[in-house]
């Protein structure tokens, strides 16, 4: 099982065993980290699951869709590491992926 490293807004780090096939958002939610709101439940329609992804994993992530890009444009905290965690599916190749929960807008 791949591991997902989640850093909260306060800098607290958790290492979570992630089931492959689940989205990063689902893994974080199922681990009880309630800082990630994910109000739409993973439908790519709210941007409340915004995370900053370790750039070392960029080549392993799927391309960003136009919808994801448009939603992230609405965030005051968007940067080059920004992704919506509902759009990232855990795979064995993503073992050790580190994401930091973005500040609330």
From Swiss-Prot:
InterPro entries: 2Fe-2S_ferredoxin-like_sf, 2Fe-2S_ferredoxin-type, Adrenodoxin-like, Beta-grasp_dom_sf
Ranges where the 2Fe-2S ferredoxin-type domain occurs: 2-105
A molecular function (GO) term: electron transfer activity
Binding site for [2Fe-2S] cluster: 40, 46, 49, 86
Stored Pfam families: Fer2
PROSITE patterns: 2FE2S_FER_2
Residues in the signal sequence: none
GO biological process assignments: P450-containing electron transport chain
Cofactor note text: Binds 1 [2Fe-2S] cluster.
Source organism, top-level taxon: Bacteria
Cofactor: [2Fe-2S] cluster
Keywords: 2Fe-2S, Electron transport, Iron, Iron-sulfur, Metal-binding, Transport
Subunit relationships: The chloroacetanilide N-alkylformylase multicomponent enzyme system is composed of an oxygenase component (CndA) and an electron transfer component formed by a ferredoxin reductase (CndC1) and a ferredoxin (CndB1). In vitro, chloroacetanilide N-alkylformylase assays in which CndB1 is substituted for CndB2 demonstrate that the two enzymes possess nearly identical activities.
Function description: Component of the chloroacetanilide N-alkylformylase multicomponent enzyme system involved in the degradation of chloroacetanilide herbicides (N-alkoxyalkyl-N-chloroacetyl-substituted aniline derivatives). In vitro, functions as an intermediate electron transfer protein.
PANTHER family: FERREDOXIN-2, MITOCHONDRIAL, FERREDOXIN/ADRENODOXIN
Record-stated family: Belongs to the adrenodoxin/putidaredoxin family.
Protein name listed in UniProt: Chloroacetanilide N-alkylformylase 2, ferredoxin component
């Amino acid at each position: 099982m791949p591991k997902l490293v989640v850093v909260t807004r306060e800098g607290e780090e958790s290492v979570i065993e992630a089931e492959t096939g689940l989205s990063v958002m689902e893994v974080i939610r199922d681990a009880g980290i309630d800082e990630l709101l994910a109000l739409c439940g993973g439908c790519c329609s709210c941007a409340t699951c915004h995370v900053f992804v370790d750039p070392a994993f960029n080549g392993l992530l799927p391309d960003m869709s136009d919808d994801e890009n448009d939603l992230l444009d609405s965030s005051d905290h968007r940067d080059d590491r920004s992704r919506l965690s509902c759009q990232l599916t855990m795979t064995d190749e993503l073992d050790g992926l580190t994401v930091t929960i973005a500040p609330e807008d």
